[in-house]
Amino acid sequence: MAAAAVAAAAAAAAAASLQVLEMESMETAAAGSAGLAAEVRGSGTVDFGPGPGISAMEASGGDPGPEAEDFECSSHCSELSWRQNEQRRQGLFCDITLCFGGAGGREFRAHRSVLAAATEYFTPLLSGQFSESRSGRVEMRKWSSEPGPEPDTVEAVIEYMYTGRIRVSTGSVHEVLELADRFLLIRLKEFCGEFLKKKLHLSNCVAIHSLAHMYTLSQLALKAADMIRRNFHKVIQDEEFYTLPFHLIRDWLSDLEITVDSEEVLFETVLKWVQRNAEERERYFEELFKLLRLSQMKPTYLTRHVKPERLVANNEVCVKLVADAVERHALRAENIQSGTCQHPTSHVSLLPRYGQNMDVIMVIGGVSEGGDYLSECVGYFVDEDRWVNLPHIHNHLDGHAVAVTESYVYVAGSMEPGFAKTVERYNPNLNTWEHVCSLMTRKHSFGLTEVKGKLYSIGGHGNFSPGFKDVTVYNPELDKWHNLESAPKILRDVKALAIEDRFVYIAARTPVDRDTEDGLKAVITCYDTETRQWQDVESLPLIDNYCFFQMSVVNSNFYQTASCCPKSYCLENEEAVRKIASQVSDEILESLPPEVLSIEGAAICYYKDDVFIIGGWKNSDDIDKQYRKEAYRYCAERKRWMLLPPMPQPRCRATACHVRIPYRYLHGTQRYPMPQNLMWQKDRIRQMQEIHRHALNMRRVPSSQIEC
């Protein structure tokens, strides 16, 4: 009633205003007629102004204005859509009902004209050809989850169809994507794909990849697939992987690029997937088993684990595949013994997957003949007993430290002043080097080891310093170093072992006030990274061959000038303390050629329980210095040392470490360019040498003239 009264009053006021305007117009017209009559009586002629089609402005010589203008209100559409949405909320003028079987059984009222204009999904549905158009009800059934989408999500998507606005979160994006796909809201669907791209992570890449396939988001599927492919060995540890349907499992096993640790792991993955729903999935086992590369499995594993497996033993095709693989291994072993071992076959099914992680002993930096710094990295490919080229580092490294983490290889420091603070890390998955935050001090010959995901830099010395006591820690997430409390004494030529992800055992040298050859004394100490306390001990814990070897040579010049890759052990510190001993057996040195221990500047590292000695030099005199390319391996299984194929070129003061690199970067012959910064520096050195040589020649000319 109040609204009607207000409307009547507004209409009366408008009518009164119109009456006043009409009276004023009539008075003006009467006055004009009287003036015109007087003018006619006075002159006998009348000037009617410009002729037809000529405006007053044109007659007076001015610019004519437009006869018509367009008006557009930019906010009108948004205000209109907002008002329509408000009407929908209030149930005004609604002529269609959306009924969701899920969503708590809720019904949502709307306007069919708006829905039909918003998406092609509703245009044919509400145009009269279907019963929904006549009944005014649209039943929405068959959702991905039993309850259906949440009511709040449905409301948000309907509001988007009215206003073009919506808020999507990680909790709602799946349902929004499903609704957008059902209602053919292409732009909203694309937005959900971009949103999921930003949220893609190792923990959700399997689920997002499945969503991308389900809703045909090709770009999102490619990005998620690439993440899964490069981290497949981690993805298969997630229980969500074992919920995937057969066709996706088959696709992944067919992929040559998946990163895996071994084919044995893939066999166990197939078994685990089948056993999750044996009644339904056993029929797929044979097809999946054919996709495994049995020739890449160890013979003992084939005979002890694969062959006795029930799913294999009860399938004739699988039994034959295992027998063929065992026979190939036997022929290969026979060829090796007879000395007729041929090059690895090129048949793709007999080679490792390109993404399979292979064991490599990586050699980094160092100095070669003539004092040339080496940026080239090389690797000893363990399975194929050969050396391969790896990417160049961007620094001149000499006396640097190395540490291996789960994802990277870090190198830091150098005797070369221009690179003494630099830190680089190698990513095996990408086969690339990248710079990270530099050290806080220029130094070399220090210890570098990982504890709980952080790198600890301990001791070292510089070109003009007797040594350092400093302890700094690097946080990879922040890409930043910060100082901790210093060690109680100077520590140089540091070698480190980490125990229990807390304690760092260190073998080093420290300056002493006594008459010795170099004024240094060997020390062994333990650093607690939690309490930051130091304690001297008698020896490194004698845990494995790597520890025994180091303690056997700890007082030798061979060990003190060598670099040693740090190693981490999972055993508790109490057990490690019990393995400390004052007397150490040198049995591990029995089969090592005696001349090896006279080498200086070698690189020492480990692989499982084996020990490697690589490169170095003989004779400290610069004139007679002999750079070495030999490499030795202590085989724990055979309990003896073996001479490996020589490195491509001799080098000393390098570092070495064990790293797992995908086969795609190891097969064939690789060539990598030298980094631009080192090429420029090399050219500059060459130019300086030419200038120096020219200057010497110029000096010789006058002196020869004087002598004449």
From Swiss-Prot:
| GO molecular function, a single term | ubiquitin-like ligase-substrate adaptor activity
Any one Pfam family match given in the protein's UniProt record, by short name: BTB
SUPFAM superfamilies linked:
Kelch motif, POZ domain
Superkingdom of origin:
Eukaryota
Does Phosphoprotein count among this protein's keywords? yes
Task: Give all Phosphoserine modified positions.
Answer: 465
- Name of this chain's protein: Kelch-like protein 11
Q: Which organism is it from?
A: Homo sapiens (Human)
Source taxonomy lineage?
Eukaryota, Metazoa, Chordata, Craniata, Vertebrata
